[in-house]
A protein has these predicted regions:
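Aromatic-rich, lipid-facing transmembrane alpha helices and their immediate juxtamembrane interface loops
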Residues: 1-137
Length: 137
């Protein structure tokens, strides 16, 4: 149950956090962006755990790749298959099918810099808590 609760919390933090960021940036959001944000934050948390000891910029490059991949898959489903038209990058440079583009991949990299720091801190605290719980037992 702890694993499920932790995953749910990560998903919620990512979903709410990204939705608020998008509202600030675009003045609107869509519920699917909360789902994508939750998935991305959960994946970034796992990525930071696997890349422990690596530099923040390497984690951020990997993170922006993960986010761009999620964005592409979500865009193919949400915008192209379902036709909901949540976003369209077709006028931006380096776009692929209007679903992802180079400028936003760079923005995801910049966003990943503080997010990977947060994930690293969460991992550090989780390790500290686990160790202290083990000592008490």
């Amino acid at each position: 149950m702890r694993g499920l609760r932790k995953r749910g919390c990560l998903f919620l933090v990512g979903g709410v956090g990204y939705s608020l960021l998008e509202i600030r940036w675009r003045r609107r959001t869509h519920w699917t962006m909360a789902a994508a944000g939750g998935l991305c934050f959960s994946l970034l948390y796992g990525l930071c755990g696997k890349m422990a000891g690596r530099s923040r910029w390497k984690k951020s490059v990997a993170g922006s790749t993960v986010i761009t991949g999620v964005e592409f898959l979500a865009g193919c489903l949400i915008n192209r298959r379902l036709g909901w038209g949540v976003w369209d990058y077709s006028r931006l440079p380096g776009n692929v099918m209007g679903q992802i583009c180079l400028p936003f991949t760079f923005l995801w990299f910049l966003l990943c810099l503080p997010v990977t720091a947060l994930c690293d801190e969460l991992h550090r605290r989780e390790g500290r808590c686990t160790l202290s719980q083990a000592v008490v037992r």
